[in-house]
Amino acid sequence: MTRLVVGFDLDMTLVDSRPGIGATYRALAEETGTFIDVDLVTSRLGPPLEAELAHWFEPERVPEVADRYRALYPDLAIPRVELLRGAREAVQAVLDAGGEAFVVTGKNGRNAALHLQHLAIDLDVVGEVWREGKADVFRARGVTAYVGDHVHDMEACRSADVVGIAVPTGPCSPDELRAAGADHVVDDLHGVVGLVPDLPR
């Protein structure tokens, strides 16, 4: 029997990061004198930071601006971000079942860990991975299920042959998540709790 190993996405899965990300983008826009439609940015969270910044900055500026964003982030974002409904319970359900839970996110690992520390969630973090990069982590860590809010999360699950559990708390609708291959679509993370007993081991 294999061990239950469940990965969780961070932004818009475990946490509502829109207020913190929005505050950081507003500060970045003011500091650089660059227009950034922050409401648009926070409506489509998921892809890596550099991919979003490329919509607003010349390609050669993206690396330095990304570094500045990440430097601003701890003070501006961490205090503004709260757990989404059922997050603590979903993680605890995995642990209570004798499983391992950890975070796999496109976000910078250091800032992701700061969120978890601030919210008193003790989980390991694998950061700066997206789409097929997440699938590689799933394979390497023996993940049996992954909880995410984005179609690319579900595509990573399909690629790595793990159970995909989707929550429509981010930019993707339930229908989009199902079409991307989600095995389960739950309203919020409380729905994950009921799925844990039947997840592969």
Which residues are covered by each model-predicted region?
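N-terminal helical cap/lid subdomain that shapes the substrate entry/recognition surface
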Residues: 2-88, 97
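Structural recognition of alpha->loop->beta junctions
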Residues: 119-128, 178-194
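Well-formed, non-transmembrane alpha-helical positions, independent of function
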Residues: 93, 115-118, 137, 156-159, ...
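Non-catalytic pre-domain segments flanking phosphatase-related domains
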Residues: 1-8, 194, 198-201
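Acidic, Mg2+-coordinating phosphoryl-transfer loop and its flanking beta/alpha structural elements
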Residues: 105, 145-187
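Short loop-to-alpha-helix "cap/lid" segments that border enzyme active sites
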Residues: 130-141, 151-155
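A short, structured active-site edge motif that brings together acidic residues
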Residues: 40-42, 107, 121-135
